[in-house]
Swiss-Prot record:
Name of this protein: Acetaldehyde dehydrogenase
GO BP, sorted A to Z: catabolic process
UniProt key word rRNA processing: no
Catalytic activity: acetaldehyde + NAD(+) + CoA = acetyl-CoA + NADH + H(+)
Length: 303
């Protein structure tokens, strides 16, 4: 029989709520707790209505129940400012932390590029970069796996309505973390990230533009093949991930244009930026659970 790993979601906002709905369908992860700090939080109320245990008194209140409820995975959907303390407390109790903030104190995780490596090493904190990073870094990695990328620039355009207060408070961290991961995981020598929050009504679907500048003339056939294969890999956990145009070659520049449609679990389908983040985080937790079930890794003993 499959053994689900039991999980807590910290942060009952847009991301936390969408993650909870996705987790309810998972074969590998069982959501048990949601932690917030606002007694009037809509997210906590929704979680309670779904049969999830909740507290509005923060992580310290939840920790008292962690061992008894056998919580093994935590998803932090709060803010970069508080993540480090959350992670320190939970890692000390043998909980694997999946960080959906731009704090990036653990290694970056882009599932089709490097998730297996993290799961096999039992990394206790993995960072999901940003929505822009999840949508674009697979494409940079697809190009850099064929030829050296001197410079990569990504532009993530998201609807204003899909961007909650947590993301707005972390815009600088968003651009820095994404650019850093474009280099470290995407394989570009230099990376740059731009986020555009579009207030248009009706809201636009998430759009992502990826420009890669190569150090030599492009191998068009193999780059195209690599990009198409990577799109299929991402579609395994984000079905609405689509190549709109490209790769387009202009001298040594390669341009790729993507859109991301969400599943519409919590926010409407235009919020692909929310979906790709939560789907990638859940895929990451599921890979850890699969490795535990197959005895490839052993979770920390805490009894």
């Amino acid at each position: 029989m499959r053994k689900k790993l039991r999980a807590v979601i910290i942060g009952p906002g847009n991301i936390g709520t969408d993650l909870l709905i996705k987790m309810k369908r998972s074969d590998w992860i069982e959501p048990v707790w949601m932690v917030g700090i606002d007694p009037d939080s809509d997210g906590l109320k929704r979680a309670r209505d779904m049969g999830i245990k909740t507290t509005h008194q923060g992580i310290d209140d939840f920790i008292d129940y962690l061992i008894a409820d056998d919580i093994r995975i935590a998803f932090d959907a709060t803010s970069a400012y508080v993540h480090e303390e959350n992670s320190r407390k939970l890692n000390a109790l043998g909980v694997v932390m999946i960080d959906l903030t731009p704090a990036a104190i653990g290694p970056y995780c882009i599932p089709p590029v490097n998730l297996e490596e993290h799961a096999n090493n039992l990394e206790m904190n993995v960072n999901m970069v940003t929505c822009g990073g999840q949508a674009t870094i697979p494409m940079v990695a697809a190009v850099s796996s064929v030829q050296k990328v001197d410079y990569a620039e990504i532009i993530a355009t998201v609807s204003s309505r899909s961007v909650g207060p947590g993301t707005r408070a972390n815009i600088d961290e968003f651009t820095r973390t994404t650019a850093s991961a474009v280099e470290q995981i995407g394989g570009a020598r230099k990376g740059k990230a731009i986020i555009v929050i579009n207030p248009a009504e009706p809201p636009l679907m998430m759009r992502d533009t990826i420009h890669c500048l190569l150090s030599e003339d492009p191998d068009e056939v193999n780059i195209s093949k690599s990009v198409y294969n990577m799109v299929k890999e991402v579609q395994k956990y984000v079905p609405g991930y689509r190549l709109v145009n490209g790769p387009i070659f202009d001298g040594r520049k390669v341009s790729i244009f993507m859109e991301v449609e969400g599943l519409g679990d919590f926010l409407p389908t235009y919020s692909g930026n929310l979906d790709i983040m939560t789907a990638a985080a859940l895929r990451t937790a599921e890979m850890f659970a699969e490795r535990v079930a197959s005895k490839a890794i052993t979770l920390p003993n805490r009894h």
